């Protein structure tokens, strides 16, 4: 089929998944890890709309995310800060470009901002309807991309922190995290979802940027077949802590730098100037507003997303930074 929407390497996974869902066939491979996006496409097909209609859906979510970014920025530092946060979300070409792609990135970027805004509002006002809406948004965002699952422990800790007592941490946060760990270790669908991302294979091969071998790091050899199970990451990291941490730091560093050796120098210059300014403003914002609850929530979300990159790979096109760039903008 021909699509006005631009297609990426993974677009076929989502359209095929939507076709299978509408036909009441089980999802295959990595498709279950992107259930939320596949359901959006399946809904379009159910309504006899072409998959290209996902573009206006993504634009609507971007508009909602801009409003959420405005709300977060306003809560932290006033209306001007909110306006700038919303502006930097919608005018950033690195984010806007994904609105026209039949890929999960645009919807995840927008949903992440909306979800964090909803949770911040919910724990400030403590109204049942807001808490229910925040939980629903959390579940939605978790299903768009595999890295959305990091929001679950984040929100458990955020809720416990908001309650403001060690008793709350012990009664809410720790049991929640323990249950999550048990689920990851015991539930086959979650295990398969993690294994499908090949984190142990990426680690053993020293891959920094996906599909760019020039920057791969030489790593110590692994035992036979050890790369077939992601749970071997722990034992490998304990055996080679320096090499593992160096690789993780390289991945995180290249994600934050955003430039790439294969980009034109003019593009790298533009990116370098933009993100140098943004990181400088981020540092000032942390110094001035660290005590604000929303800032702590946003920083925690940024750190967790960087952690996911550290355990997997940096993207070839730099898109992983765009997933949480609006949080930096706020």
Region locations from a protein language model:
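Transmembrane-helix signature of polytopic, membrane-embedded enzymes
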Residues: 53, 69-91, 109-110, 293-300
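Loop-to-helix entry region of an early transmembrane alpha helix in multi-pass inner-membrane enzymes
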Residues: 31, 35-39, 47-67, 98, ...
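Transmembrane-helix motifs of polytopic, lipid-linked glycan transferases
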Residues: 53-76, 114, 280-284
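Short hydrophobic/aromatic helix or loop-helix immediately within or flanking a transmembrane segment
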Residues: 10-21, 27-49, 56-60, 248-252
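Membrane-interface anchor segments at the N-terminal boundary of transmembrane helices
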Residues: 53, 239-307
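Membrane-proximal stem/loop segments at transmembrane-domain junctions that anchor or position
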Residues: 183-265
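Multi-pass, polyprenyl lipid-linked donor-dependent membrane glycosyltransferases
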Residues: 6, 32, 53-61, 84-114, ...
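Membrane-interface transmembrane helices that cradle and orient dolichyl/undecaprenyl
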Residues: 74-79, 115-130
């Amino acid at each position: 089929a021909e699509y006005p929407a631009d297609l990426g390497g993974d677009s076929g996974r989502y359209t095929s998944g939507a076709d299978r869902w509408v036909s009441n066939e089980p999802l295959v491979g990595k498709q279950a890890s992107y259930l939320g996006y596949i359901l959006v496409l399946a809904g379009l097909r159910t309504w006899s709309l072409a998959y290209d209609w996902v573009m206006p859906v993504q634009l609507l979510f971007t508009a909602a995310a801009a409003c959420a970014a405005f709300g977060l920025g306003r809560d932290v530092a006033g209306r001007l800060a909110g306006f700038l946060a919303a502006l930097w979300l919608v005018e950033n070409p690195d984010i806007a470009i994904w609105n026209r792609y039949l890929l999960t990135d645009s919807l995840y970027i927008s949903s992440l901002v909306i979800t964090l805004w909803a949770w911040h509002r919910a724990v400030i006002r403590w109204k049942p309807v807001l808490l229910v809406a925040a939980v629903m948004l959390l579940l939605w965002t978790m299903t768009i991309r595999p890295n959305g699952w990091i929001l679950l422990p984040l929100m458990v800790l955020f809720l416990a922190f908001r309650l403001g007592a060690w008793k709350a941490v012990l009664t809410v946060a720790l049991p929640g995290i323990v249950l999550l760990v048990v689920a990851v270790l015991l539930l086959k669908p979650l295990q398969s979802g993690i294994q499908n991302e090949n984190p142990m294979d990426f680690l053993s091969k020293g891959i920094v940027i996906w599909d760019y071998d020039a920057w791969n790091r030489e790593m110590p050899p692994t035992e036979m077949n050890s790369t077939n199970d992601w749970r071997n990451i722990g034992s490998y990291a304990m055996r080679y802590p320096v090499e593992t941490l160096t690789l993780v730091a390289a991945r995180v560093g290249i994600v934050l730098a955003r430039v790439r050796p294969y980009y034109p120098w003019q593009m790298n210059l533009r990116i370098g100037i933009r993100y140098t300014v943004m990181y400088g403003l981020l540092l000032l914002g942390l110094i001035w507003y660290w005590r604000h609850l929303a800032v702590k929530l946003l920083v925690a979300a940024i750190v967790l997303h960087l952690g996911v990159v550290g355990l997997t790979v940096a993207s070839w096109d730099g898109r992983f930074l765009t997933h949480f760039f609006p949080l930096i903008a706020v």
